[in-house]
Amino acid sequence: MYFWVMFFTLMIKVKLYITNGDIFQNRPTVYVVYLGANRLKNAALASSHHLHLLSKVFTSKDDAEQSMLYSYNNGFLGFSAKLNSTQAASLAKLNQVITVFKSKSLKLHTTRSWDFLGLAVDNARRTPPPQLAYGSDIVVGIFDTGIWPESESFRETPEAKPIPSSWNGKCVGGEDFDPSVHCNRKLIGARFYLRGFEETYGTIDFTRDPEYRSPRDYLGHGTHTASTAVGSVVRNVSGFFGLGRGTARGGAPLARLAVFKTCWGKDLEGVCTEADILAAFDDAIHDGVHVISASFGYSPPLSPFFESSADIGAFHAAERGISVVFSTGNDGPDPGVVQNVAPWAVSVAASTVDRSFPTRIVIDGSFTLTGQSLISQEITGTLALATTYFNGGVCKWENWMKKLANETIILCFSTLGPVQFIEEAQAAAIRANALALIFAASPTRQLAEEVDMIPTVRVDILHGTRIRNYLARSPTVPMVKIGPSKTVIGETTAPSVAYFSSRGPSSLSPDILKPDITAPGIGILAAWPPRTPPTLLPGDHRSIEWNFQSGTSMSCPHVAGVMALLQSAHPDWSPSAIRSAIMTTAYTRDTSYDLILSGGSMKSTDPFDIGAGHINPLKAMDPGLVYNTRTDDYVLFMCNIGYTDQEIKSMVLHPEPSTTCLPSHSYRTNADFNYPSITIPSLRLTRTIKRTVSNVGPNKNTVYFVDIIRPVGVEVLIWPRILVFSKCQQEHSYYVTFKPTEIFSGRYVFGEIMWTNGLHRVRSPVVVFLSNAGFLASS
């Protein structure tokens, strides 16, 4: 027991994110050398050129070849290699090199959700639901920890159509993964990338480590996210030991799956290196994926966009018509910690669904309360306060008083200590040999649908206090009975934003709102490798095929599934049109018609919590108008973040003759980027911005009228106030003028702009930072 409890404690510590850095400081480090867009049609020629460049900083060509890890020669140009700082600096001075940066390590951001989003499979409609009508022509690439191919989620159905002719990818074999057996018309691609990881952390010993040198998944994260995005329809799923049973499927169950294993197990979590990530993007672009889902990132401070493999890969994917979706990270609820903030990808926050698992707590046969848990069978024992077993009543490993709590259920409070993570209290209870745990904490910071190593019922502070007071008054040692849990749907107000979901504003580009959208990310039940314990802990010997997971990692594939449906239904839409459809049709009110609440507090959400709102797949199918982003928007963005004309021409796939940072750009900020949201990062005097919309609705002749919710202290004027369309794909521009009417020394205020024609409501959130007090005083 001591061995795996130590691992349990380690899991708590790694939640705080291990500091990135060079593991071996006395040896060369892996660097990425980025050269821009790929206009060479010959991959061999590009690789030869990369080796030629690398040879400039080595004494021989052989040394250069041994140093190189990857040559990126499909979707973009560049390479990764083992270099010392002097060699890296020398390469950075070459004219054709845009950036050179160290390969950092990224971390993973780790059912009922699709019913909650309105995409039920079992319904009384005569027409098939969208996910059964669209998607078979779409390939979704999952960048994660691999795949468990035997899962029913990835089986080939008899009615599956042939693999799309546009597919250029392949299945790569390896340990316990045979492409002829494990790949089919559902799982059509599987690759794995290990060079960057092993150069950074050392060679994996696969004889001792449970990992696989193949696309096969051990950590479970990749299997879970793939199942969420595109899992086939699986009826009568038993769920997690009987909880959450029903029909399981992904958002686009007909879509094809391509797996890119970029992340590997280290210290009980998934780690992905930038060299490997960029190689996966390069292959995904070549292979012909339509959507990429990547649930990883790293905490701020964020690297510049073109010193980040994820952002570079996403940029070139978007230029080639591939939609990319990232998770925002699990560093909330503090503001300004949102990750993956590039404007050419979609960033997803996490929210709850309306499913709960109520668990009765009965003390002495009469005193009854209800908590939340995943307990499959009834548990009975004596009830005790934490003060009986832990110094000061603080449920932590180091506070144990070496008294055993045999057949005892312990009551712990998060506020004592405090106990930052519930896993701390669970590890302490296991060390004391407790039977179970009742954990009292703020309801806004509880994750009820978590798989526990020791049975744990979550209650709020009020209920915890009532239990404590009962104990204090009881003349005898109380007996308590808990469980089993039940599955209840539709009685919980939802959605609310997860407390851990990383919030805006963006620390890298505050004039682009991030996150973009919110999707389910708490208690998501999806496929799981049966050889992997549900908690990943060595002492956990349970085997399951479906597991609950929480995190923005889980919300990300929800959006990827919706993107696949939209791409299939509207094959002529660009990635920016798909993003726009998702954002402008999002909603901001919960099932009780109140504003969505922000977990971690009791306040209503603002755009920094939820972006444009909560995803609404059915509405996104027909948004009416979309905001398209074009090359000149990206050029404007790059000019404003400091890139030169020549660098921009190298990065953009099809540069126009006007691809240059003219002086006229000096007064245009990224607020003019044709984004579905509007952010003014510093409003002092009157400011006017421009947006352009395209008519993609079913009616070519239509008229849209504008409605405005003004931010506090800001006058908002829009011209024109009416948009008249006479054909499909017709574009119209409008201008928005912001003028402060009150004086603030620095405050964010929020509003929205909505265009409606009676059938469609095209909504854009507005964020304004008012900072006019000092400016007016100095004037």
Curated annotation (Swiss-Prot):
Keywords (alphabetical) are: Autocatalytic cleavage, Glycoprotein, Hydrolase, Protease, Secreted, Serine protease, Signal, Zymogen
Cite the SUPFAM superfamilies for this sequence.
Answer: Subtilisin-like (SSF52743)
What is any Pfam family matched here?
A: Peptidase_S8
Question: Where in the cell does this protein reside?
Answer: Secreted
Q: Might you give the EC number(s) for this enzyme?
A: 3.4.21.-
Domain called Inhibitor I9: residue spans = 30-109
Single GO MF annotation: serine-type endopeptidase activity
Q: Which residues are glycosylated?
A: N84, N236, N406
Q: Does the keyword Glycoprotein apply?
A: yes
Question: Catalytic residues per the record?
Answer: D144 (charge relay system), H221 (charge relay system), S553 (charge relay system)
Pro-sequence residue ranges? 22-109
Q: Please list the GO biological process terms of this entry.
A: double fertilization forming a zygote and endosperm; proteolysis
Peptidase S8 domain residues are: 113-621
Q: Which region is the signal sequence?
A: 1-21
Which superkingdom does the taxonomy of this entry point to? Eukaryota
> Which GO CC terms are listed, alphabetically?
extracellular region
**Family from the record:** Belongs to the peptidase S8 family.
**Protein name per the record:** Subtilisin-like protease SBT3.18
Task: Please name the source species.
Answer: Arabidopsis thaliana
